[in-house]
């Protein structure tokens, strides 16, 4: 039988929790090492399932990968394999981020269409269009993205939407293209900035990271480097929301609060006291949270990854909240599980209207993705009795030491077979 969590509600969470490296950053950094022959070292890697999965992807492409605690040492060969059509690639979404580096380094790639979280359509149209503008052919053939180029040349690329994945794949091909590439409407997420920082350390010439317009001057080759992953803002915010929901007092370290300003402002609006330093923040909630409206948007807006936690918070807030999802269309299936817990919520697929109740009621629930799983656990913390959360392998893909950290903060939670 698959593992599950049993969460006993009613405890106030308090204490300090340290956040590790960002899941949404480390996997792309690992892929970027393919661009330079030799050994690169990435530190502050989170202890999550997706890191060894990405290591398997890189090994399948000819790299040597050593994982030691929070350190990944990746040796990229002089001629990486370009065919990424094997089981590890199909297991999770981020594996598609090897497309850009392979096209850049090998001038060809064959990458199996990836799996990952069940949160709606995430087409690769913009990835393909961007690579075509750089001079590559790029098509879907027999379940794989197949790309090839004689020469990559810089281009003016206008993204329809500031897609993180498309920005990163185009970026990692453009850094070794001839001439100058400009990406308009580029993603501004801290994870993209982190990737640009590492690429520049490798010898790339990327300007404008964190702004809507990114300029890349291609260079003939890149070199290995050492880089520290930024702290995980999504994990950090999850702990902040947990403090607000349980009327707790949690200090979160190892993350830049500048990456979370819209979230911290929403917690303040919900009645929490929020204090910040350069690399930490503290959330204290004394009363029942107030209802707040949330609309997900690309950075610097409210992250779509935190939408389930926003719904969980709204479910026990004083008043009615509207949560609007503007990024992934299928993310509201989480609401069905919240209704099992007694939440008063309804959705039309784009909005969720949630009328807060003083308390939820325990029930068996099932995770559909990483963040929905975390949201269900937070809901279990404020439900009466024991809530069983199933399919928790999703949570393990994105939250290091999740049960251990919750227990340290005072939650009553256990992992059972």
UniProtKB/Swiss-Prot annotation:
<dbReference type="InterPro" id="IPR001986">
    <property type="entry name" value="Enolpyruvate_Tfrase_dom"/>
</dbReference>
<keyword id="KW-0573">Peptidoglycan synthesis</keyword>
<dbReference type="GO" id="GO:0008360">
    <property type="term" value="P:regulation of cell shape"/>
</dbReference>
<keyword id="KW-0961">Cell wall biogenesis/degradation</keyword>
<comment type="function">
    <text>Cell wall formation. Adds enolpyruvyl to UDP-N-acetylglucosamine.</text>
</comment>
<dbReference type="InterPro" id="IPR036968">
    <property type="entry name" value="Enolpyruvate_Tfrase_sf"/>
</dbReference>
<dbReference type="Pfam" id="PF00275">
    <property type="entry name" value="EPSP_synthase"/>
</dbReference>
<keyword id="KW-0131">Cell cycle</keyword>
<feature type="binding site">
    <location>
        <position position="327"/>
    </location>
    <ligand>
        <name>UDP-N-acetyl-alpha-D-glucosamine</name>
    </ligand>
</feature>
<feature type="binding site">
    <location>
        <begin position="23"/>
        <end position="24"/>
    </location>
    <ligand>
        <name>phosphoenolpyruvate</name>
    </ligand>
</feature>
<dbReference type="InterPro" id="IPR013792">
    <property type="entry name" value="RNA3'P_cycl/enolpyr_Trfase_a/b"/>
</dbReference>
<dbReference type="InterPro" id="IPR005750">
    <property type="entry name" value="UDP_GlcNAc_COvinyl_MurA"/>
</dbReference>
<dbReference type="GO" id="GO:0019277">
    <property type="term" value="P:UDP-N-acetylgalactosamine biosynthetic process"/>
</dbReference>
<keyword id="KW-0133">Cell shape</keyword>
<keyword id="KW-0132">Cell division</keyword>
<protein>
    <recommendedName>
        <fullName>UDP-N-acetylglucosamine 1-carboxyvinyltransferase</fullName>
        <ecNumber>2.5.1.7</ecNumber>
    </recommendedName>
</protein>
<dbReference type="InterPro" id="IPR050068">
    <property type="entry name" value="MurA_subfamily"/>
</dbReference>
<keyword id="KW-0808">Transferase</keyword>
<dbReference type="GO" id="GO:0008760">
    <property type="term" value="F:UDP-N-acetylglucosamine 1-carboxyvinyltransferase activity"/>
</dbReference>
<feature type="active site" description="Proton donor">
    <location>
        <position position="117"/>
    </location>
</feature>
<dbReference type="GO" id="GO:0009252">
    <property type="term" value="P:peptidoglycan biosynthetic process"/>
</dbReference>
<feature type="binding site">
    <location>
        <position position="305"/>
    </location>
    <ligand>
        <name>UDP-N-acetyl-alpha-D-glucosamine</name>
    </ligand>
</feature>
<keyword id="KW-0963">Cytoplasm</keyword>
<dbReference type="GO" id="GO:0071555">
    <property type="term" value="P:cell wall organization"/>
</dbReference>
<comment type="similarity">
    <text>Belongs to the EPSP synthase family. MurA subfamily.</text>
</comment>
<comment type="pathway">
    <text>Cell wall biogenesis; peptidoglycan biosynthesis.</text>
</comment>
<dbReference type="GO" id="GO:0051301">
    <property type="term" value="P:cell division"/>
</dbReference>
<dbReference type="GO" id="GO:0005737">
    <property type="term" value="C:cytoplasm"/>
</dbReference>
<feature type="binding site">
    <location>
        <position position="93"/>
    </location>
    <ligand>
        <name>UDP-N-acetyl-alpha-D-glucosamine</name>
    </ligand>
</feature>
């Amino acid at each position: 039988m698959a593992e599950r969590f049993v969460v006993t509600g009613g405890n106030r969470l308090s204490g300090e929790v340290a956040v590790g490296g960002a899941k949404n950053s480390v996997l792309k950094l690992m892929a970027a090492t393919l661009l330079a022959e030799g050994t690169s070292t990435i530190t502050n890697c989170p202890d999550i399932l997706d890191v060894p999965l990405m290591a398997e992807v890189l090994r399948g492409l000819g790299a040597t990968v050593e994982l030691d605690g929070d350190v990944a040492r990746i040796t990229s060969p002089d001629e990486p394999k370009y065919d990424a059509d094997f089981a590890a690639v199909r297991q999770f979404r981020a594996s598609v981020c090897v497309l850009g580096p392979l096209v850049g380094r090998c001038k060809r790639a064959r990458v199996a269409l990836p799996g990952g979280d069940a949160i709606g359509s995430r087409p690769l149209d913009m990835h393909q269009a961007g690579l075509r503008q750089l001079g590559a052919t790029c098509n879907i053939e027999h379940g794989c993205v197949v790309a090839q180029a004689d020469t990559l040349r810089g281009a003016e690329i206008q993204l329809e939407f500031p897609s993180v994945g498309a920005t990163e794949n185009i970026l990692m091909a453009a850094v070794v293209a001839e001439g100058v590439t400009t990406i308009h409407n580029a993603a501004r997420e801290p994870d993209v900035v982190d990737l640009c920082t590492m690429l520049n350390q490798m010898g790339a010439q990327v300007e404008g990271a964190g702004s809507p317009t990114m300029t890349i001057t291609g260079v003939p080759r890149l070199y290995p480097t050492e880089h520290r992953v930024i702290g995980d803002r999504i994990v950090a915010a999850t702990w902040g929301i947990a403090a607000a929901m349980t009327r707790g007092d949690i200090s979160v370290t190892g993350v830049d609060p500048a990456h979370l300003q819209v979230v911290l402002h929403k917690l303040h609006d919900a009645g929490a006291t929020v204090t910040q330093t350069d690399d930490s923040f503290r959330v204290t909630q004394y009363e029942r949270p107030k209802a707040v409206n949330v609309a997900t948007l690309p950075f610097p807006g409210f992250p779509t990854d935190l939408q389930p936690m926003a719904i969980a918070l709204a479910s026990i807030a004083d008043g009615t909240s509207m949560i609007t999802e503007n990024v992934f269309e299928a993310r509201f299936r989480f609401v069905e599980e919240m209704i099992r817990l007694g939440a008063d919520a309804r959705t039309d697929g784009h909005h969720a209207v949630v009328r807060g109740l003083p308390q939820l009621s325990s029930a068996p629930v099932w995770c559909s993705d990483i963040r929905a799983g975390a949201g269900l656990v937070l809901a279990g913390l404020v439900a009466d009795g024991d809530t069983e959360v199933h399919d928790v392998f999703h949570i393990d893909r994105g939250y290091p030491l999740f049960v251990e950290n919750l227990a340290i903060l005072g939650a009553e939670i256990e992992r059972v077979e």
